[in-house]
Amino acid sequence: MESVEMNNPNSQTLDQPPPSSNGDTAPLALDHMNPQNSESVALNGSSTPIPDTNGSSAKPELLRPLLSENGVSKTLSGNDKDQSGGEEETTSRRKRRSRWDPPPSESINNPSAEGGTDSGTGTRKRKSRWADDEPRTQIQLPDFMKDFTGGIEFDPEIQALNSRLLEISRMLQSGMPLDDRPEGQRSPSPEPVYDNMGIRINTREYRARERLNRERQEIIAQIIKKNPAFKPPADYRPPKLHKKLFIPMKEFPGYNFIGLIIGPRGNTQKRMERETGAKIVIRGKGSVKEGRHQQKKDLKYDPSENEDLHVLVEAETQEALEAAAGMVEKLLQPVDEVLNEHKRQQLRELATLNGTIRDEEFCRLCGEPGHRQYACPSRTNTFKSDVLCKICGDGGHPTIDCPVKGTTGKKMDDEYQNFLAELGGTVPESSLKQSATLALGPGSSGSNPPWANNAGNGASAHPGLGSTPTKPPSKEYDETNLYIGFLPPMLEDDGLINLFSSFGEIVMAKVIKDRVTGLSKGYGFVKYADVQMANTAVQAMNGYRFEGRTLAVRIAGKSPPPIAPPGPPAPQPPTQGYPPSNQPPGAYPSQQYATGGYSTAPVPWGPPVPSYSPYALPPPPPGSYHPVHGQHMPPYGMQYPPPPPHVTQAPPPGTTQNPSSSEPQQSFPPGVQADSGAATSSIPPNVYGSSVTAMPGQPPYMSYPSYYNAVPPPTPPAPASSTDHSQNMGNMPWANNPSVSTPDHSQGLVNAPWAPNPPMPPTVGYSQSMGNVPWAPKPPVQPPAENPSSVGESEYEKFMAEMK
């Protein structure tokens, strides 16, 4: 360093004036961190030695500020070089502070270090290029922030509490016996306490564990009080403050302290807990019903059950505890029943909850609360009060005393009936009966519908309200105004005028339309200038068919006339006619039909009117087919019923066959006879034989002549015939009038045991006819010459002989 000083021509001492040129700037200071180099700092120009930190003497030196051309101090950076050259800078860079050197005594930003001597090392510090231009201000934290910086943890008291907390937690979790004191050092045991199962609760181990738990809770509470940032364990429960307030039941046995504290449905107790934040419960003898003790067997033993009746107040803070205790203490002081406002409020609240409160009743005359109707001050006044009825809208009486409150439903029924009347519908029979029953006065007609009465007359509708029941005035109708119902939906007023203008002068014609949609409602009104015109229009247009609708025309306002139930329709002639009695054999007899109304009852022995189903064609005249004698040809598809014992029965309706679909259908109207020649030429021969045409299309329901007591009229005699009757259905056993047998009966059924009478000789042409079928009307025949009973007995004897 001395060589550097000697070789530097620009170095000057402090006693010399500073140079004016730029080349007189002081060189950079040497590394002041090394104390060995402090004595060689001669470039400051100080000749007075000063003691070094190591004890060596050094010259006192002053730092000369670096001045620029304008006189402002200049700071050189690492790259800045002045006229002194780079030797000093190279020397200063070689000597850097080690990381193990002690820290400097002053900051590089200390202004005193720049202006004079360095108190720590006596050297000037070089400013780094990364140093801040302005020094940072030191922040002084308040005292309460020290708790959050972690410095509070080093408090001896907190450390002692933490160590004790860890020790207690270790003892509780180890499972080792907590009370291991010898026999002589133990304290006397308290009185044993047993649970509901007879097991002792307060054992030595249990008491030791409870003692450690209480101590642990207290330590945690103290740590939280000293260090609010302390996080307690998860199982920590803050201890609650509690206070017992005994109820003076012995001093005041008849006073209801519990009711005043709990209140109606517990509302008073809940209100005090909500206002104070404390918990208020009643404990002791008598606080729990006797039946509840059996339900609490599994619960923890509560030593307060054997204490006197008291109120237990629990709170987390002392303020909440004192507030709740003050409220309860006021209720524990007995007060006279007359002056007990608290009890009166509880009773009012209970009545409100039960819905039986009566303090808010209003007077029915004036509507004001506070007095009854009999004590109303405006009882004798005649003015109308401000009360408005919600039913009739009238003042002077409340809604509950409305005289027409019971007629709301009847009014709706009347409106509905008016609506039906406008639509042209009929009135239900029940409404007519009801109006007849509720007739008012002796002169009122019970047949009028409800809308025909004067419903707006309040006196007649309610004669029991002080009014004299009088006959309601009859409603006057405008005979010239007509109601027209069931109009087409597209009919307008002009169309209505054109429809009814032919009956006279029309004063007004209107089709009623919907106000919202603008469409026709289906009815309207026409007003004529004269009553005669209106009556003519009613007679002509009522029931008139117009565009697929039947118009209903009547006087407006009047109910439609009652419609009588329609009678049974007159019987119409069937599609196939019945020939008269003088037509050829095989046809049906003629029937007489009434043109209208009710028909007369049929003759008891005659058959009922057959159904209107198609019947079989009439048989061809005799001689068309000649069956071979001796050949058995039963009817096609015919089924015979089993023979009934000794009783003549009619065939069931389902035993007949329909005619073949290939047969042509032919109908004869009543009164028209079938021509045998025409029938012969029009009917083709049948391939199934002559018996096929003998079956009707659908059997009608038959009558049983044996059920009637009347005797049928006598029949005219019939000539004998030599025609073969083996294929004739007239010989069937269920025939009512069988024909007389002929000599050839080889293929007939007349000898069947169930035949009641021997057959009679039919007329010519009955061999293939249906005239002898029992459900067909029989032509008049003469009674047989021989006795039918003797013939029946002979046939029965033949049958019995064959059976043997």
Curated annotation (Swiss-Prot):
Residues 1-139, 175-195, 437-476, 556-595, 623-695, 709-804 are annotated as: Disordered. It comes from Arabidopsis thaliana (Mouse-ear cress). This is Splicing factor-like protein 1. Expressed in the shoot apex, flowers, stems, leaves, roots and seedling. The modification Phosphoserine is found at S84. Residues 559-587, 640-654, 776-786 have a biased composition (Pro residues). Residues 1-15, 34-57, 678-693, 724-749 have a biased composition (Polar residues). Residues 446-464, 625-639, 657-670 have a biased composition (Low complexity).
